[in-house]
């Protein structure tokens, strides 16, 4: 069996959720969209359900996957509904929905729900993606308040630059949100992972931790000391499947983008860009071979990559290779490849997942 696999530490996931909730000081929605950022949404939700305040997903398909797996906790649709017909499923499966536009308010007003639907009313405070404009926000809130088919309303917005601690945009967005929601008696949700980790002065009744749940700080590490308590959740491993001894002056891999400058031991690892390892990883990107840092050499191919073992003579066929996890961390590897940690985690494919404390793989 091909040795490439990921180990998901569910204890670390629970630890990170508790830390996020403590930081926020209120409740916290565990964001498990995009298959829990590549970690497996169902298994992650099952691990958190006993203590979670709720989950957040992108769309109704992701929510239904959790419901079909037996998850009973509240689930919020972060993108809301795309068609009015989806309200039937939202009501049937007891989902919460974001309302981010006036047509959604009208659709909900025309829908006769058998039970009240929880609504998160979203303000566009300056990200200019989803959300009602400030001038529409109060009228939408008042309209929803009058509807018997609407349950609790949470007021929310999304921060665009909270990962930049010296940028004034976060405070500007918070001010827009405070002004637009002034006098509205309702819980508020402002902070995503960056907001929770970097902006202690911003209070949310509901936090929305996403990337930090999986042990990754979205803020550059030198900018905050709060990443320390986070524990990595995903460790990606493979093994050496071949070792070659090359003289100086030999090209390695497609395009000869690496040429040996000395006699070199080259290890071949069963992991490539089809598995989710970054195609654009540069020479020198660190990997851990039997616990020792070794540099990537040559271009990453579809199914394999190559590593310099010259200074690690004990490494041989069968040696374990950690692609990311504790060392290198997800953020470190992403920086080497000019990617975001989000891309790296969500792009993991064709790799078996094992869950610590559980049997079997997905």
UniProtKB/Swiss-Prot annotation:
Entry keyword set: Isomerase, Pyridoxal phosphate
Pathway this chain belongs to: Amino-acid biosynthesis; D-alanine biosynthesis; D-alanine from L-alanine: step 1/1
Classification via SMART domains: Ala_racemase_C
Catalytic reaction list: L-alanine = D-alanine
Residues that coordinate or bind substrate: 129, 302
Cofactor (UniProt): pyridoxal 5'-phosphate
InterPro entries for the chain: Ala_racemase, Ala_racemase/Decarboxylase_C, Ala_racemase_C, Ala_racemase_N, Ala_racemase_pyridoxalP-BS, PLP-binding_barrel
Enzyme class label: isomerase
KW Secreted (keyword) present: no
GO CC terms in record: cytosol
Highest taxon of the lineage: Bacteria
Active-site residues, Swiss-Prot/TrEMBL: 33 (proton acceptor), 254 (proton acceptor)
Molecular function as annotated in GO: alanine racemase activity; pyridoxal phosphate binding
GO biological process assignments: D-alanine biosynthetic process
UniProt key word Ligase: no
Sequence similarity: Belongs to the alanine racemase family.
Entry protein name: Alanine racemase
């Amino acid at each position: 069996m091909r040795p490439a696999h990921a180990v998901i530490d569910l204890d670390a996931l629970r630890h990170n959720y508790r830390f996020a909730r403590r930081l926020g000081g209120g409740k916290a929605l565990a964001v498990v969209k995009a298959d829990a950022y590549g970690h497996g949404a169902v298994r992650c939700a099952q691990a958190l359900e006993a203590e979670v305040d709720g989950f957040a997903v992108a769309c109704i398909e992701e929510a239904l996957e959790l419901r079909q797996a037996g998850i009973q906790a509240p689930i919020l649709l972060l993108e809301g509904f795309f068609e009015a017909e989806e309200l039937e499923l939202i009501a049937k499966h007891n989902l919460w929905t974001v309302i981010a536009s006036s047509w959604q308010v009208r659709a909900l007003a025309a829908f006769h729900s058998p039970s009240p639907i929880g609504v998160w009313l979203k303000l566009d405070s300056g990200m200019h993606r989803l959300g009602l404009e400030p001038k529409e926000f109060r009228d939408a809130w008042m309209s929803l308040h009058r509807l018997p088919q609407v349950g609790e309303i949470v007021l929310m917005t999304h921060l665009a630059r909270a990962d930049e601690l010296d940028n004034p945009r976060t405070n500007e967005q918070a001010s827009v949100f405070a002004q637009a929601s002034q006098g509205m008696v309702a819980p508020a949700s402002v902070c995503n992972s960056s907001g929770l980790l970097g902006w202690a002065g911003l209070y949310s009744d509901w936090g929305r931790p996403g990337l930090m749940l999986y042990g990754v700080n979205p803020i550059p590490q030198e900018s905050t000391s709060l990443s320390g308590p986070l524990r990595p959740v995903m460790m990606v491993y493979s093994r050496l499947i071949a070792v070659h001894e090359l003289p100086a002056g030999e090209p390695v891999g497609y395009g000869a983008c690496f040429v040996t400058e000395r006699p070199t031991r080259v290890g071949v690892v069963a992991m490539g860009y089809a598995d989710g390892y970054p195609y654009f990883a540069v020479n020198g990107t660190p990997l851990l071979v039997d616990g020792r840092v070794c540099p990537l050499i040559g271009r990453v191919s579809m199914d394999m990559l190559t590593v310099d073992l010259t200074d690690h003579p004990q490494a041989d066929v069968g040696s374990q290779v950690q692609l990311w996890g504790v060392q290198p961390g997800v953020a470190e590897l992403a920086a080497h490849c000019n990617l975001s940690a989000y891309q790296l985690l969500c792009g993991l494919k064709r790799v078996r997942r094992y869950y610590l404390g559980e049997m079997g793989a997905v």
